[in-house]
Amino acid sequence: LGNGIDPLKVIDEYGADALRMMLMVGSTAGNDMRYSDEKVTASRNFANKLWNASRFVQMNLPEDFEPGMPAEELLDMSDKWVLSELARTAAEVTANLDKYELGLAAEKVENFIWDIYCDWYIEICKSRLNGEDAQQADTARKVLVWVLDKALKLLHPFMPFITEEIYQALPGSAETIMTQEWPDAGKMTAWPQECADFEVLMDYIKAVRTIRNDMNVHPAKKTSMTIETANPAAFQKGGAYLARFAFATDVALTEKYTGTTDGVVTVVTPAARGFIPMMELIDREKELKRLHKELEKAEKEANMFRNQLNNPKFVERAPEKLVNETRTKLAASEDKIANINQSIQALG
């Protein structure tokens, strides 16, 4: 019929691991799944992400590096967070596999590696690895390797080739990953309070970075901030993270903010409100001009997609995939318009 997929051609283009992972993620027992190049590309991108992360870790290991878990008193907030998340992921993935929920298990391993290990923990470790505290640098290296080792074992059933290749390159690795003990969450330590505090910090940092991006503030420009919160402990412990990732020069904590709101942008999360004098970092008139130009462009795009979808001939005759893509693009354009309008309102 000409509508089949030759798996060997897919493997040649994307790799066997990418195809295997695509077939697992999002699949449920008893249901058919639709093949798409986009999904295989996403799985290949994940493999590339993992490979690059492992290369970064290996490049930062000295020749005399000895793997192992550091003593608890040497672990900082981010170490305890990533180790707690690893324990949670191992427990959930094991439970999913016991119930033959392969799609859920694969998705959870991918989310842990991509979002938690690569996007957050590795980024956090960069300043520690390059810092003057040799003990902290060694602790970061040990946790990076220990977590990577366990994550590779969790991922191995789904992506056996890349996990074996990376595992073999790790210090202290055995002959093959296939014969290694499965990560047992019951043998891992978790720190619920440290983990919860770090999640509070992450929510706040994400919100600050989002609004800085929306207002086109360069990362080199830093400012003070006042944080109104009923949970000051998380922010007290996380001062270094606020300086590094929220671009704070200094942080004041308060139960109730009573300062001025003129030229101040408010950042709201479930656990805190941040008050940041953002206007001192930007050229207000120049930024408003840029935003209005972006708004005009986004409105033109939205109108184009809207006109297509309002045309009965397009909806009836165009391929279903194209119609759905147009709906998705319209929704994205409308979200963009809303975000731009919020930024314009914030600038007054």
Regions found by a protein language model. Name each.
Residues N31-K39:
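Short, solvent-exposed helix-loop connector elements
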Residues L1-N31:
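Alpha-helical recognition segments enriched in aromatics with Gly/Pro capping
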Residues L1-D6, D12, E38-G348:
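Feature 926 captures the class I aminoacyl-tRNA synthetase adenylation module centered on the KMSKS loop
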